């Protein structure tokens, strides 16, 4: 999408702010706002520690406290509607720019409800000296240059169109694996 946004923000905030109230019906805006603060603010810790905290939020929801006008209340704000997947908003962005230690542009980002869960790095098979290893090196470079994007990462994908592999931010290149089907066989990625 062509979106006017702050490049320092890796989230697709417009979508996130629209979807959270829809999948958390019955919760007041104060609870949603508190969850937004929590998922946008990570103080201290390594990238992996921040990613683990976000993964907990993604799986279990964000525990929040808010004032309802009479008393302090607590709630759990879900980031994804696992019960009704069609209530979630899926977006793929081509060339998503993030300004971290420097400005970088990831080839593709897969967003779920405005959360950048998948980073895809593509390399051209027509370039002789380029392969999937170069895509891995580029992903590692992004983790150093724009670490805020990878706080929210579920997994990364690298491809040179001859080979497509997926792995996590902690995986070495040898731990990135080819796509498999439900029965455990490998998908043809040609």
List the model feature ranges, each with a label.
Residues 1-190:
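An alpha-helical interface "stripe"
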